[in-house]
C-alpha cells in the first residue's frame, strides 16, 4: 500500500516539507494496519496514537482520512472509512510546558549571558555554536546567520527582535571574544548560568532553553523537518516527542 502514497501526494498542491510530513504519518499508518484496511486494524491504529497530544492526533488522522478517501476514489478499497478524534483529557504534567520568559528581554547586569540565552531561546543555537560565531557570519541586512559545525553548513533566519541585540557585538572577529580570540565553553557556561540565576531561573539550562525554542516553533506551526534543519540535526528522531 505504500506505493500509493506518492500518487496521493503528487495530486496535492503542497510544499516538499509538507509532503515529507504526510509521507511519514502515512507510512506509520500503513505499518500499523499491516497493509489491510479493516475496522479492527483502524481501531488498533487509533489506539496506537492515543497518547499523542490532541493536535498531533488531529494532524495524523487528517492525513489518514485524506489518504483513505483517495484510495476509495481510486477504487482501491471497497468502502470509505473515516477516523474521528476521540475526546481525551491529557494532564498538564504530561505536556511540555511553554514558559513565560519575556523578562529575558529586559536589561541585565550580565549582558553577554543574556544574549546567549536569547540566541538559544529564539534561534535554537548551542552554546558551543554561539561561541564560534564570527562577525562575518552575521548579516543583519538579510537577517541571516551562517553556522558551520563538523563540516556541516547551515543558514538560519535571525528574528527581527534580535537584530538590535546583535548590533553592539559586531565589532571584532567573534561575537564574543577577548583579544581577537573566542571565549572558552566554560566562560560561556558561567555567563549563561549567571544570567539565569539573576532571572530567578537557576533550574533552566542551555538544553531546556533549546527545548523552549522547539516548543515555540511548534506553537507557530513549524514542522519538525524545518526545526531539525535549523538545529542542524541529521534526523528527526530526537524530535519525535514533540509530534
UniProtKB/Swiss-Prot annotation:
Cellular component per GO? Answer: cytoplasm
What compartments host this protein? Answer: Cytoplasm
One Pfam annotation reads Phage_integrase
Record key words, sorted: Cytoplasm, DNA integration, DNA recombination, DNA-binding
Protein family according to the UniProt entry: Belongs to the 'phage' integrase family. XerD-like subfamily.
Record-level GO BP terms = DNA transposition
| Highest taxon of source | Bacteria
InterPro entries the UniProt entry points to: CB, DNA_brk_join_enz, Integrase-like_cat_sf, Integrase_catalytic, Integrase_recombinase_N, Integrase_SAM-like_N, Tyrosine_recombinase_XerD-like
Start and end residues of each Tyr recombinase domain: 85-243
This protein is called Tyrosine recombinase XerD-like
Q: Where is the active site?
A: 149, 210, 242
- The Core-binding (CB) domain covers 1-72
A GO molecular function held by the record: DNA binding
The role this protein plays is: Putative tyrosine recombinase. Not involved in the cutting and rejoining of the recombining DNA molecules on dif(SL) site.
Q: Which organism is it from?
A: Streptococcus sanguinis (strain SK36)
Amino acid at each position: 500500500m505504500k506505493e500509493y502514497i506518492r500518487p496521493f501526494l503528487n495530486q496535492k498542491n503542497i510544499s516538499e516539507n509538507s509532503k515529507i510530513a504526510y509521507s511519514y504519518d502515512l507510512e506509520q499508518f500503513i505499518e500499523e494496519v499491516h497493509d489491510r484496511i479493516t475496522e479492527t486494524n483502524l481501531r488498533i491504529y487509533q489506539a496506537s496514537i492515543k497518547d499523542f497530544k490532541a493536535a498531533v492526533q488531529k494532524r495524523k488522522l487528517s492525513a489518514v482520512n485524506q489518504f483513505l478517501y483517495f484510495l476509495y476514489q481510486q477504487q482501491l478499497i471497497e468502502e470509505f472509512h473515516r477516523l474521528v478524534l476521540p475526546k481525551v483529557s491529557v494532564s498538564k504534567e504530561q505536556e511540555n510546558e511553554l514558559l513565560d520568559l519575556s523578562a529575558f528581554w529586559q536589561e541585565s547586569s550580565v549582558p553577554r549571558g543574556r544574549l546567549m540565552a536569547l540566541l538559544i531561546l529564539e534561534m535554537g543555537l548551542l552554546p558551543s555554536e554561539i561561541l564560534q560565531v564570527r562577525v562575518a557570519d552575521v548579516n543583519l541586512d538579510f537577517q541571516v546567520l551562517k553556522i558551520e559545525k563538523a563540516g556541516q553548513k547551515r543558514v538560519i533566519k535571525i528574528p527581527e527582535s534580535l537584530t538590535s541585540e546583535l548590533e553592539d557585538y559586531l565589532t571584532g572577529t567573534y561575537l564574543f571574544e577577548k583579544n581577537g580570540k573566542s571565549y572558552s565553553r566554560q566562560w560561556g557556561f558561567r555567563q549563561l548560568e549567571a544570567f539565569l540565576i539573576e532571572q530567578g531561573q537557576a533550574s533552566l539550562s542551555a538544553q531546556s532553553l533549546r527545548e523552549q525554542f522547539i516548543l515555540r516553533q511548534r506553537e507557530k506551526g513549524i514542522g519538525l523537518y524545518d526545526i531539525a534543519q535549523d538545529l542542524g540535526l541529521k534526523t528527526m528522531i530526537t524530535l519525535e516527542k514533540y509530534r
